[in-house]
């Protein structure tokens, strides 16, 4: 009986007040990682940000924090949490750095500035993507007949839209299944469905 005890959001949750409250009432811990604007209330001279009642809310746009770069995408915010956990728990950095491919895709597709940390995420992610071992990504590119170098265009106009196509299909879970699947036949079946 593996019970879920923690929910970590990625790129959402900053306005999910009711949903976070329900999860907390059900006994779950909730960490919100998001980059979207935070709701504010203005009581006189001071503006106050209104946050969901999660165990932690990680958002570079929080005014009570002094994180130097506020234009991270949702995937990058979640990646930063993972990096902190990997450091604390002595995690496998090769695995963590392998996720830069997804952070690069998220950075381009979330249409944030390609400056500061975002620029580094995209450069490093593209280096890895051009030699990727991720079968789901390879299958999408193959099914899209993409045979050139993977660049920002590939992220923004081939990979990103293909992954987002799941919203138009019966279930958005198809993209996640594609990225996690290990059976090569199933991977290509899912890629064909998306492309």
Spans of model-derived segments:
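Acidic, glycine-enriched active-site microenvironments
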Residues: 26-27, 32, 40, 70-76, ...
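Amphipathic alpha-helical transducer elements in NTP-driven molecular machines
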Residues: 17, 72-75, 79, 119-122, ...
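Short, well-ordered alpha-helical packing segments
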Residues: 20-24, 79-82, 126
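N-terminal small/polar loop signature for handling phosphorylated ligands or for N-terminal nucleophile
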Residues: 1-50, 58
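Hydrophobic helix-and-loop "lid/oligomerization" segment in the mid-to-C-terminal part
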Residues: 1-6, 25-27, 45, 53, ...
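A short, charged helix-loop
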Residues: 38, 52-66, 77-86
């Amino acid at each position: 009986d593996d019970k879920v005890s923690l929910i970590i959001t990625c790129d959402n949750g900053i306005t999910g007040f009711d949903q976070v409250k329900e999860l907390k009432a059900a006994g779950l811990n909730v960490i919100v990682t998001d980059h979207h604007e935070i709701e504010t209330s203005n009581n006189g001279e001071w503006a106050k940000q209104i946050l969901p009642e999660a165990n932690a809310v990680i958002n570079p746009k929080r005014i009570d924090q002094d994180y130097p770069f506020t234009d991270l995408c949702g995937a990058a915010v979640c990646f930063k949490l993972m990096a902190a956990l990997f450091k604390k728990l002595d995690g496998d950095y090769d695995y963590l750095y392998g996720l830069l491919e997804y952070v690069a895709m998220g950075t381009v597709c979330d249409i944030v500035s390609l400056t500061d940390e975002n620029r580094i995420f995209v450069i490093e992610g593209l280096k890895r993507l051009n030699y990727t071992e991720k079968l789901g990504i390879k299958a999408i590119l193959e099914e899209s007949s993409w045979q050139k170098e993977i660049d920002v265009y590939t992220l923004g106009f081939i990979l990103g839209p293909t992954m987002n196509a799941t919203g138009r299909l019966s279930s958005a879970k198809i993209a996640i299944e594609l990225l996690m699947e290990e059976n090569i036949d199933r991977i290509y079946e899912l890629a064909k469905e998306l492309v």
